[in-house]
């Protein structure tokens, strides 16, 4: 009996000790933040804890996937909405010294919520207030802070020049920090490549709280954060980017065709020609289930979106020669400036003011979603497409985006940056399912895995490649506080192919103790 009482007392003492250890860590962390920052740049107003009435709203404001939200997460210690670079430095140093993990959030477009969730004690380092943009028209360059959105960047570029642009994504609310570090895919890809192909310098806070840039950054680290994801190596503060030339007149179109209108034949032909078209032309195909002629019956429609760096007359000639099956008409085409195409890609009516590019999220995410990705090396047989359509028709709301490669992407070596998906790809697929009822989550996740399995014979293999910016936990993951090298090799080989080993070597040099880690981070080579 005495032994039982002793054991119970011991358990109680350990429990009390654990509870008391957690609280001092929080207090020590907050005290450290105040001590590590200059009073001229006070950090107090940047810190949100569970005691703040605005804590929950701060947490959800920059998270766009309701599936990943957990406002009552007891592991979340604080949110630091940095307003000065020194706040970032202090957060890194203080989190490390107190054994607290960091999640870095810029635009909140993390498809699996890895930038704002964790199963171990953590803080969110929110970058959205660091949003300065400086344009140098003469040098055709810009500095853009990690918290600036792509819409803000595009607006600033257009205000400075009508014939300059940046090769980035079409979504205006993407944060520059995460979007660029994961690759940065957009509709200028065939002409100019992806975002990381135009990064020439960066400012990054390392594991010791130092700001590395220029000569101190190191060519190996600059290589790694261009496509390897910055959050494995430090905190991206800003990027120095090269801008690209665009003509004063750019032409866009959007054409829909259904199964009943023979879209399967058109899409098969699209596979044969889309990566071989002139590199000034980007022609996306977007299959999705829609209501048929009879409302109770669904069919498949494919929306063909195009952007051409030139006139409608030249575009019509190219399309009539290469894809007459689409039946493009002159009235389908709209000529406009490059900046105005950015609203077109967001499905705004033609002529919508580009001021919408400056809109930022003001509340919690309204929908749940799941995304996956694939790379296609050879055309999917026409007779096999029926299987794909059947799998898609099981969803209430999903679509694919078939994004063409070719052009300059065939000329950039796979190891030029950490982003490896270059020559040999016809197109990249994004799968996207959207729903609003939490009770439908299980079913939709199952359907996404089903269609991903259905597509296996038609996509890359050994490994089955994946795009880092379309974060997908299904391709492999580690627990928040651990790093299993064998598991890391699984997702690392899919995201980075032959570049994964070099990424681990860079990681070992700049973060040997693996402080910057999360479920799909890059482990140091020393873990081998």
Curated annotation (Swiss-Prot):
Its main location: secreted. It comes from the Eukaryota. Keywords: Cell wall, Disulfide bond, FAD, Flavoprotein, Glycoprotein, Nucleotide-binding, Oxidoreductase, Secreted, Signal. Residues 1-19 form the signal peptide. GO terms for cellular component: extracellular region; plant-type cell wall. There is a cross-link at residues 109-171 (6-(S-cysteinyl)-8alpha-(pros-histidyl)-FAD (His-Cys)). Its cofactor is FAD. The keyword Transmembrane does not apply. Pfam families: BBE, FAD_binding_4. InterPro entries: BBE (IPR012951), FAD-bd_PCMH (IPR016166), FAD-bd_PCMH-like_sf (IPR036318), FAD-bd_PCMH_sub1 (IPR016167), FAD-bd_PCMH_sub2 (IPR016169), Oxid_FAD_bind_N (IPR006094). Residues 69-246 form the FAD-binding PCMH-type domain. PROSITE patterns: FAD_PCMH. Glycans are attached at residues 20, 35, 52, 72, 256, 340, 439. One of its GO terms (molecular function) is oxidoreductase activity. Its EC number is 1.1.1.-. The FAD cofactor is bound via a bicovalent 6-S-cysteinyl, 8alpha-N1-histidyl FAD linkage. SUPFAM superfamilies: FAD-binding/transporter-associated domain-like. Disulfide bonds join 32-94. It is found in: Secreted, Cell wall. The keyword Protease does not apply. Belongs to the oxygen-dependent FAD-linked oxidoreductase family. This is Berberine bridge enzyme-like 17. It comes from Arabidopsis thaliana.
């Amino acid at each position: 009996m005495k032994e039982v009482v002793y054991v119970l007392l011991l358990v109680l003492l350990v429990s009390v000790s654990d509870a008391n250890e957690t609280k001092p860590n929080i207090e020590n962390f907050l005290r450290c933040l105040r001590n590590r920052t200059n009073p001229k740049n006070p950090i107090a107003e940047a810190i949100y804890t569970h005691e703040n009435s605005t804590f929950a709203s701060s947490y959800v404001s920059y998270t766009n996937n309701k599936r990943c939200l957990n406002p009552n997460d007891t592991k979340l210690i604080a949110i630091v909405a940095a307003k000065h670079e020194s706040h970032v430095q202090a957060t890194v140093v203080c989190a490390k010294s107190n054994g607290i993990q960091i999640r870095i959030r810029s635009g909140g477009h993390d498809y699996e919520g890895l930038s704002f969730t964790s199963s171990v004690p953590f803080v969110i380092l929110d970058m959205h207030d660091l949003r300065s943009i400086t344009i140098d028209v003469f040098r055709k360059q810009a500095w853009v802070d990690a918290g600036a959105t792509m819409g803000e960047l595009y607006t600033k570029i257009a205000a400075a020049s009508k014939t300059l642009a940046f090769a980035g994504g079409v979504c205006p609310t993407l944060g520059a920090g995460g979007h660029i570090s994961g690759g940065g895919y957009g509709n200028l890809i065939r002409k100019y490549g992806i975002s990381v192909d135009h990064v020439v310098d960066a400012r990054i806070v390392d594991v010791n709280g130092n700001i590395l840039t220029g000569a101190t950054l190191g060519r190996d680290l600059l290589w790694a954060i261009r496509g390897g994801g910055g959050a494995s190596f430090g905190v991206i503060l800003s990027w120095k980017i090269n801008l690209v030339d665009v003509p004063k007149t750019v032409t866009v179109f959007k054409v829909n065709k259904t199964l009943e209108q023979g879209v399967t034949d058109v899409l098969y032909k699209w596979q044969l020609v889309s990566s071989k078209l002139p590199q000034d032309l980007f022609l996306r195909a977007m299959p999705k289930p829609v209501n048929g002629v009879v409302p109770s019956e669904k069919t498949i429609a494919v929306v063909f979106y195009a952007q051409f760096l030139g006139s409608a007359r030249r575009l019509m000639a190219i399309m009539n020669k290469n894809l007459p099956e689409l039946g493009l008409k002159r009235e389908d085409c709209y000529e406009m400036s490059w900046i105005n195409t950015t609203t077109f890609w967001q499905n705004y009516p033609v002529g919508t003011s580009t001021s919408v590019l400056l809109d930022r999220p003001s509340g919690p995410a309204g929908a749940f979603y799941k995304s996956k990705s694939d790379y296609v090396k050879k055309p999917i047989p026409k007779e096999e497409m029926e299987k794909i359509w059947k799998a898609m028709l099981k969803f209430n709301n999903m679509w694919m985006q078939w994004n063409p490669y070719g052009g300059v992407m065939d000329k950039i070596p796979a190891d030029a940056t950490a982003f490896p998906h270059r020559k040999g790809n016809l197109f990249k697929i994004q799968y996207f399912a959207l729903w609003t009822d939490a009770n439908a989550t299980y079913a939709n996740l199952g359907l996404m895995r089903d269609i991903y399995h259905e597509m296996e014979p038609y996509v890359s293999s050994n490994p089955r490649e994946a795009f880092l910016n379309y974060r997908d936990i299904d391709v492999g993951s580690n627990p928040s506080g651990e790093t299993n090298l064998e598991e890391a090799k699984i997702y690392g080989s899919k995201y980075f192919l032959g570049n994964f080993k070099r990424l681990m070597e860079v990681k070992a040099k700049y973060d040997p103790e693996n402080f910057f880690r999360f479920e799909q981070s890059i482990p140091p080579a020393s873990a081998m």
